[in-house]
Amino acid sequence: MREVILADAVTRPPPSAKRVPVLSFSLESQSGSVAMMTQPVTELLEIDDLAPEPQEEWQRMLRFVGFGPETRRAALPTVETLLKAAHEMVVETYDYLAHVPETAAVLGWESAVDPVHLEERRRFFTVWLSRTLALDTSDEFALDLYRAGTFHAADGPRRIHTPEAYVTGSIGLMLGAFSDRMTRAQLPGAVIGPAMSAWSRFLSAQLNQMLFGYRLAMDMKRGAAAIRCAFFGRLRALVDTSEIVIHTHEGAPVRDVLRKLFNYYPRARAEALERRWQSHERQNSAWADLTSTYLPRYGWRVLLNGRDLEYAGGFSARLGKADELSIFPPGR
């Protein structure tokens, strides 16, 4: 063989067709004859190892802790008692946080409590407590808890980082407050015991959901290479911004940044990516393992420094510190 030429022979099918991109290789021999070979490149556009969507993680953890109909019924006799004490619990919680030096420093209240900030915090906490006492297990609540976790990672309006130890500790404080109010109300021990078991399970699932969001948000900040990601069209409404910086290590594949991006923005994942399941047979077993991978939906494009990655190396292309990604929905 005298020469090997890599040529792009990917064609865009109509929307109704199933897309199967290929790379075409033209091999010229010494005799001048040409042989053509094609190789599917679908795998070059795959994004694997994505975290579960927040709704999936929420339902998984509720099942794990056993928060089902019987557990809900155990909590119900205490709801009225806790609701009557709700405002008092909100006020006492932030009084406590303001007087503990570590949490006062986190909130920026070392010298004095900011009344506007305090009002914001109490409002959020009141809404959370109301939904908790309503035993809300909806997907909407799952997303709100996930978002609260990202706010703890300094992604909220005030950019305050709340270390996860204090989030975990706060859940313990609330369980203690619940138990205290039930005891003050002189509820029977036969009610308090099962109810505290139920509230512990429910708040543990909530804690996991917030830490889930926190850890994915912190992952966006890890790495020396700061990659600017620009969004266009309807994608901007889904992520509520026109661009964001995602950190990774220099030389990482584009796939790594996209994985962080679509972990962090679950609504964008549902819109831009198509989930596919793959079966992996086990040796000497009747069982098979199912794994999921994601591909861009038809018409979605990811550009690295202006070059469409469907035609330029796929998501395995390596990133440098000054690189930029642009993501376009269909029609752009």
Segments from the language model and where they lie:
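Ala/Thr-enriched low-complexity intrinsically disordered regions
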Residues: A7-T11, A17, A35
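Short, Lys/Arg-enriched N-terminal segments with co-localized hydrophobic residues
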Residues: K18, V22-M36
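Charged, compositionally biased N-terminal leader segments and the immediate start
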Residues: F25, M36-R73
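Short terminal or interdomain "cap/linker" segment that borders an active site or interface and mediates
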Residues: T38-V41, L50, Q55-R60, R184-A224
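Heme-based O2/NO sensor domains and their adjacent alpha-helical segments
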Residues: W58-R63, L83-T183
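Phosphate/oxyanion-binding loops and surfaces in catalytic or ligand/nucleic-acid-binding neighborhoods
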Residues: R131-L135, A205, Q209, G213, ...
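Ubiquitin-like/PB1-type beta-grasp interaction modules and other compact soluble beta-rich domains
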Residues: D219-R332
